[in-house]
Amino acid sequence: MTKKEMLYEGKGKKLFKTDDENLLISEFKDDLTAFNAEKRGNESGKGALNCRISTEIFHLLEKNGIKTHLVETISDTEQVVKKCKIVPIEVIVRNVATGSLTKRLGIKDGTVLPFALVEFCLKDDALGDPFINDEHCLILNLVQNEAQISEIKNMARKINSILTPFFDNKNLRLIDFKIELGLTKDNELVLADEISPDSCRFWDKFSNEKLDKDRFRQDLGNVKMAYEEVLKRILN
C-alpha cells in the first residue's frame, strides 16, 4: 500500500490518502494538547504507545462485536483504517465524576455514578466543543434521525460494558472516555479515531494514581511512564 499526500492533521494524528480510495493511513503523533489546544507539549514515543494501546483495545472490541475502522497496524505509529465520514459529535461516557462534570454540576470529584452517563459535545474547536443534547443533534443535522442517536448511545454503552471489566481486571479504573464514530461507504456506523490514555481517564484501582493525559493537563509529570504502565497492564 502506498502512502500518499496528507489529507488532514488533527491534534493527535495525521491522515494520509493511499492508493485505495476506501482506505487511509492514520499516523499517531507525539504531540500533547489540552484545554482545546491552548496548552501544548510533546512526548517522544507517545504516538507509538497510543498506536499500540489503541490497536489492542480495538481488537478486543472487534472480538466482542463492536465494528471499528481499523484494518491493520503497519508500523509502530501507523494504522490502515477504513475511510469514514466522521459524525461531528464527540461522545463521552462517564463512570466516575471528575473534570468538567464536577465543575458544571457540582458533583464531588471521584463520585461513582449510579450508571454510565453518556454525553455529547459538538466537534467544533472555534466554539470550544460545547455540550449538546439529542435535540441539538437533530436541529443541527449532525445525525440522520433519532434512531441513529439511539444507535450511537447503545454503541457507547456497549463499549463501556466491555472495557470497564477488562480494565478492572488490569487494576485500572476506567473513569471516563471519549470516542468518535464514523459512517463507512456502506453507511455502517463504526468506532473511529482511537481509544488510549489521550482519550480516556485511567486511575490505578488501589491508589487512584492518574495514568492518562491528566498528567499533562495538571502538570503531574511522568506522562510517558504512565502511558507505558497502561500498555504494560493491557498486555499482561
Swiss-Prot record:
Keyword Lyase: no
One Pfam entry name: SAICAR_synt
GO molecular function annotations of the record: ATP binding; phosphoribosylaminoimidazolesuccinocarboxamide synthase activity
Keywords: ATP-binding, Ligase, Nucleotide-binding, Purine biosynthesis
EC number(s) recorded for this UniProt protein: 6.3.2.6
Enzyme class: ligase
Catalyzed reactions: 5-amino-1-(5-phospho-D-ribosyl)imidazole-4-carboxylate + L-aspartate + ATP = (2S)-2-[5-amino-1-(5-phospho-beta-D-ribosyl)imidazole-4-carboxamido]succinate + ADP + phosphate + 2 H(+)
Pathway membership, UniProt: Purine metabolism; IMP biosynthesis via de novo pathway; 5-amino-1-(5-phospho-D-ribosyl)imidazole-4-carboxamide from 5-amino-1-(5-phospho-D-ribosyl)imidazole-4-carboxylate: step 1/2
GO BP terms: 'de novo' IMP biosynthetic process; cobalamin biosynthetic process
Classification via Gene3D superfamilies: ATP-grasp fold, B domain, Phosphorylase Kinase, domain 1
Listed InterPro entries: SAICAR_synt/ADE2_N, SAICAR_synt_PurC, SAICAR_synth, SAICAR_synthetase, SAICAR_synthetase_CS
Similarity annotation: Belongs to the SAICAR synthetase family.
Protein name as annotated: Phosphoribosylaminoimidazole-succinocarboxamide synthase
Gene responsible for this protein: purC
